[in-house]
Amino acid sequence: MASALTICAQTPDSVATVASPDTLNQVADGLSSPAEEQPVAGLSGETLAQQADSAYTADNFVLAETLYLKALEVGGSSTTLYYNLGNAYYRQGNLGKAIVNYERALKLDPTNADARANLEFVNSKITDKQIDSGSYMDSVWEGTVGMFHADTWAVIALVLFAIFLGALAAYIFSSAVAVKKASFFGGLIVFILTVCAVIISFAAANRVNSDKYAIILPPSSQLSTSPREARSQSEQAFLLHEGTKVEIIDSIANPGEGMWYEVLVGHGERAWVKASEVEKI
């Protein structure tokens, strides 16, 4: 697994042993020239990630980006790889892509404190400040679902269910009135918590597979009131800037205009944006 890098304090921590400049040059040549792909051909995702770490530590952020992407392609999704890829994008000044990958890291592991800290750090640098468009209860629900990974919520549900079975056994087999009362009411509460944990576990799993959120990538993007380029000032909805997070609520393929997404921003404001100007998380 690639080691985690941090840019919270604008200074990266040490990573894996740095490859020699000659090795990095060979890797770069293999990536840039199809005829010379032997340096990276057949490498495992872990090896590619280690080479990416070395490139990052050598301040070769473009090569690090390419290697992290290849590591993801070969080895599959990883919260650490997305996190480190986000760092590589940040070092190139690509805040939009950095935010996308920090968000992806948190989708896979909501407990990734470094990714959360870096996401907050980069969000503080973008033009449009993030505004929660949901209600207080929506925020509480999202915070609860995102507290742990779906598997962790499933384990919590199993533990609670085991406690419920213990309370049920105490209620059935105990002859003491006080024990029966305590086990009945305690078991009822634990059963309700078990159901809640199961629901949250499914919601957390669905969140990982969901792609309803996206990030604006260009320095600025003019949103429209309809799924086409604004043809007059009245068709211009509002302007969003790189790094802004939007919620996709609809999509349409407009002949001659390409794919467009209807998005929700801020306090419930809706508008249409070109699909090519956002990247789904």
Q: What are these model-predicted stretches?
A:
Residues 133-174:
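Membrane-embedded alpha-helical segments of integral membrane proteins
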Residues 95, 181-222, 226-235, 247-249, ...:
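Boundary regions of SH3-family modules and the immediately adjacent low-complexity/disordered segments
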